[in-house]
Amino acid sequence: GGATFNPIFDEHCQSIGSVEIDPSNPDNIIWVGTGETWTRNSVSVGDGLYKTIDGGSSWNKIAGFEKSERIASVQVNPKNSDEVYVGVLGALFSDSEDRGVYKTLDGGKTWSKILYVDKTTGCSDLYIDPTSPNTVYASFWEFRRSAWNFNSGGNNSALYKSTDGGKTWAKIHKGFPAGKLGRIAFAAAPSNTKILYAVIESEKDTDKGLYRSEDGGANWTKLNGDFELVVRPFYFSRIEIDPRNPDIIVKAGLSGSISRDGGKTFKTLGPMHSDIHDIVFDIKNSDRIYAGTDGGVYRSWDGGTTMEMVENIPVSQFYHISVDNEDPYNVYGGLQDNGSWFGPSSSPGGVEASDWVRVGVGDGYRVLPHPTKKLVYSEMQGAENVWRFDPAKDQAKTIQPLAVKGDPKLRFNWNAPMATSAIKPDRFYFGSQFVHRSEDMGETWVKISPDLTTNDPVKTEQGNSGGLSRDNSGAENHCTIFTIAESPLDENIVWAGTDDGNIQVTKDGGKTWTNVVANVPGLPKNTACWHIEASVFGKGNAYAVFT
């Protein structure tokens, strides 16, 4: 029940889209589809489909899905373990013919693609009716992301049904909103599989919401359009039904919500960390609910009224780490949606959670120790705040650079860059589209560069991002500086790499800058520069990472 966990997949891809336990052999056969399907611009790709027949002791990579990138769903026929369906959502930034629904009749040895829409529309969910396994439902979602924009929805998004094991398919849209559709989350009631629920992203805001069918999808009726149901459908697209009661529905979202009257009204689930992405009922005791959130795994023993955190599973995600020269040295890092921290690399009896010190909130990214003083720099997403933290006093001071009157609005990357100086310890750098420099640990700032990005107006309209559901979190901010490095051998040499493909360098402390990206052989235009490391051996040398 979550009391203990053991890792069984660490040697393989760590980005997971779907886990399916074979209903006929749950102790041994597990399928894993890789690639995260909550399509933020920073999610990792998968490398295909895996299967174990010994409960996770060993895994076989299944041929045919190497280019799938994101597998949204795996479904096993409960009456025939060799019959398996796989829904491939597919590539995030490009066209892909690997999208669609696939089927095997021999346990994964051979596959047939049984439903395909086009290169831009992938399968976002699948369901096999356990009472009639030839009945299969599949939702398809048309979407496309670029580094600076996201578009959810189109004419090809749809919910399909097959009653002959995938030989033929039909859209089941009677009662759906007119016009373009986006992501469709759906589920069937285990106690009565004729009852279906779907949360639909639609062209009109008034049409978005929860729909119900009582005849296997032949007809649909809208029930509810509460904010928590429709918020960020590309990111929160999971709905589950109580296995005993078709009128109890839970929906993932910012806080998670539950209905006990068939979807007419919803209440917030018990307190959890925000951003709930997955929820499941215990099939033997539906009062027990598990939730996967940005803050970890939670469980409920009382049908969602209260939720408790499962604190024995390490699932935090570090964006970036740094270290100091203490003995033992300390490790500094920012966590996805869980703040910024530092802690010792070793401790008598082992490092414990209580040894770690929080130095920031929100999405942390870079956390840097002052080179000579016991101070720590940290930030949150989009440079909404930048801090200088004094651990001895347990005090933090806000120090982020601000736009000067008359200057253009500052564009900060979601993971904005900061850097310290090995030559002048109190010097601190921060990046927007400009390089900002402070000589007094962030008390005052000066710009030492012009706009070092391409400043492409097409790529700086994040207010229009989202498609059918406007989404302007700041994560798509583009034409920004992503990495800064001062030479440890010459304080006048400073490097800056941008997310839109520039490498700029100054040799005179910021008076003049030169874009040297053309000197990188074989680099495609506009390739993001993710990191620059100035050499400790040659003052004109640097190492760069691109993606």
Show where each model-derived region lies:
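Beta-propeller blade termini and top-face loops
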Residues: 1-547
